[in-house]
């Protein structure tokens, strides 16, 4: 999996004809963060930030996943979403 493939997928996911489900978006978000940042490096958001907590929790579940593996999984998911929603 190349950086160019990952960058292309990151642009394509923004152009899907239909907005993916919240669950799909969390998957995309968490794998993007793991691929670009690595393990969670911030504190968990506060009690009232439900969206922020969901995103943080999803990313934190990938702790220990290599950036390369997260990148590969991200690109595969974007390809799946392109087939499902169109671009």
From Swiss-Prot:
Protein name: Acyl-CoA-binding protein
Keyword Metal-binding part of the UniProt annotation: no
Job of this protein: Binds medium- and long-chain acyl-CoA esters with very high affinity and may function as an intracellular carrier of acyl-CoA esters. It is also able to displace diazepam from the benzodiazepine (BZD) recognition site located on the GABA type A receptor. It is therefore possible that this protein also acts as a neuropeptide to modulate the action of the GABA receptor.
Residues involved in an acyl-CoA binding: 14, 29-33, 51, 55, 74
In-chain residues carrying the UniProt-annotated modification N-acetylserine: 2
SUPFAM superfamilies (alphabetical): Acyl-CoA binding protein
Assembly and interaction partners: Monomer.
Keyword NADP tagged: no
Gene3D superfamilies documented for this protein: 1.20.80.10
Keywords in alphabetical order: Acetylation, Endoplasmic reticulum, Golgi apparatus, Hydroxylation, Lipid-binding, Phosphoprotein, Transport
Listed PROSITE patterns: ACB_1, ACB_2
Subcellular compartments: Endoplasmic reticulum; Golgi apparatus
Residues found modified as N6-succinyllysine: 8, 17, 55, 77
One Gene Ontology biological process: glial cell proliferation
Record family assignment: Belongs to the ACBP family.
Ranges for domain ACB: 2-87
List of residues that carry Phosphotyrosine: 29
Highest classification ranks of the organism: Eukaryota, Metazoa, Chordata, Craniata, Vertebrata
Origin species: Rattus norvegicus
Main location: endoplasmic reticulum
Modified residues (N6-acetyllysine): 8, 51, 55, 77
Modification N6-malonyllysine occurs at: 55
Top-level taxon: Eukaryota
């Amino acid at each position: 999996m190349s950086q160019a493939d990952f960058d292309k997928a990151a642009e394509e996911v923004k152009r899907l004809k239909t907005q993916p489900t919240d669950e799909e978006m969390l998957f995309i978000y968490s794998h993007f963060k793991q691929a670009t940042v690595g393990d969670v490096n911030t504190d968990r958001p506060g009690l009232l930030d439900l969206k922020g907590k969901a995103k943080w929790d999803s990313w934190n579940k990938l702790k220990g996943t290599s950036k390369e593996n997260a990148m590969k999984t991200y690109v595969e998911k974007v390809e799946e979403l392109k087939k499902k929603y169109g671009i």
